[in-house]
Amino acid sequence: MDLQDQVQRRIDELAGTELGLQVAVYRQGELVVDAVAGDGVTPETLYFAASTGKGASATVANVLVDRGVLDYDRPIVEIWPEFGAHGKDTATLRHVLTHSVGLPALPPGTTRKTLSEQADRLAATEPWWEPGTKMTYHAETFGVLVGEIVRRATGRTISDVLREVLNPLGIEENVFFALPGNQRHRLAQLVEPEGAEETFAMLAGMFEQVVPRAMQPRAAVVNRPELLAIEDASSAILTARGIAKLYAALIGEVDGVRLVRPEAVPVITGPALVAQDELLGNPATLALGYSIGRLGSSADESPATIGWPGMGGSVAWADTRSGVTFALTRTLFDPSGSASAIEIGNLVAKALC
């Protein structure tokens, strides 16, 4: 049984509880798994994938660095002068990409409708620490900061630049930071599992210091297309095939397209920061905009793998050693973990990595 059949059989079994799944795998630029399960789910179904989308915003930034538009170590104030308030004049894109810039908290009261106003407020905010000296996961401010840096450098929104990056790959309708009105019909309606309220409440309390409750993802919120139409580069609305292909073009060549020069790949994907998360307490090994280590394993166990998981159970990763990229999306928006993403990811890694 080939890998396509193995994955298809397993997600068909999982669809009873997961409700819907997409899995896509690229190897050396070739699509080798493209599987879906669940009522109404097709490879073109769009999923709100939460922080899995950070891989797309990081990739936009890295492409712009490779093109000479941005620089990892040039002070942000050179393109965004107001950002230097409260001693942030030494902060760089590298600090933002490694979650060490010291601005993990959205201003209190932020909602999706006011998210576009937060870049100016973050620029005026005192950092939690001197940029680059500590880190904690910038769950929602990551996208605000990367998006504004991209806008200042290019004069365009990060959504516009993302579309430019995606166009040569033919996936410009497969990864979005803001859901266009003409794509609303493709959006999957996520479902929270029964009995999950306690877990959601626990996570809300854990993140409330940095993410106001109105910005914390719940199915009732992210199932509303009008709210997903608001640009948020900390998340994405995507297909598994789209984000897997984006990662494949980052680490190698797909359909004759490379997003960055080959010599840039180890710079982008190698360890850029090893630290203890100041807020969450976990050890973190980060590349330039990505977590190192396959979901379900540590950075030491899978040091050639970069990616991001998303709350609710989606994930996308790329293994630079084997040239394999993997993505999974699902309809069940489960806050308690990503067991299916780990299981199917391990199945793929065992076969190909």
Language model region names:
Residues M1-V36, E44-F48, K134, R151-S159, ...:
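Catalytic loop of the DD-peptidase/beta-lactamase superfamily, centered on the K-T-G motif
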Residues D89-T92, F142, T239-G242:
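An acidic site on a long C-lobe helix of protein kinase domains
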Residues T125-G132:
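Cytochrome P450 catalytic-domain "roof"
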Residues T141-R152:
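Hydrophobic mid-domain F-helix/FG-region of cytochrome P450s
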